Every structure is written in structure tokens, then in C-alpha cells.
Amino acid sequence: MKALFLLLSGKESPEKFRIGLRAAARSVAAKRYDDLKIVFFGPSEELIGELKDEDLQNFESLFKAGAIDSACIAEAQHYNVEEKLKNKGVVLGHAGERIAFYVNSGYTVISF
């Protein structure tokens, strides 16, 4: 099975964001899926530039593993976090296109 983790939660629910990031990192480390990709969308994009401790470690391990696909450029502009995302190495693209690509490629969407 292939999974797309769609991280949507932000400052309104940071624990939900952390759970998604942690679950993704543990899933990649344990090779639970044939493939796992992450798309950050909306409020979650604000948190990426503020990551620390376990969250930062999880993000970095996912980045090194190639699991992080992208963040939505329109939402990055809306939240004024384009530079923070680019500084973390996150590719900016159109989330709708990326989600459609993964769904059409047989990935199951899991959202946090």
C-alpha cells in the first residue's frame, strides 16, 4: 500500500500536526508502507518554520528519506511563509495537483 499523509492542521491544533509528523516518521522508519509521501497544506505550513525538538528531528528524517513531497505555494503565500519553507528545503507547488497525482497513482490519503 502507498500512503499520502496530508498535513492540514496548524496552530489551531498543533498536537494533531505533531501526531501526523510523528506517525509519518515512524511509518517510514518501520517501512509500514510501500511508499509514503507528505504534502503540507494550509495551516500546517505555518508550523514548519517553527519546528524544534522531536518535531524537527521527525521533519529532518522524513526530508532525508525523500518522503516530503511539497507544500502548497498558494497557502505559503497566504500565510507569508514562502521563505521559511524554502529555507527548510520544501518544494512549493500546487497542492491540488500533487494530491490528484498521488490519488491517481493509487495512494491512500491519510489526513492530519
Please place each PLM-identified region on the residue numbering.
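Short, glycine-rich nucleotide/cofactor-binding loops
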Residues: 4-20, 43-51
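Histidine-anchored nucleotide/phosphate-binding helix
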Residues: 16-30
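Short internal beta-strands
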Residues: 24, 35-41, 69-75
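Short, intrinsically disordered low-complexity segments
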Residues: 37-47, 63
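A glycine-rich helix N-cap at a beta->alpha junction
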Residues: 52-82
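A short aromatic-anchored loop/beta-hairpin motif
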Residues: 61, 80, 86-100
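Short, structured coil segments at secondary-structure junctions
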Residues: 65, 88-89, 105
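C-terminal binding/interaction regions
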Residues: 105-111
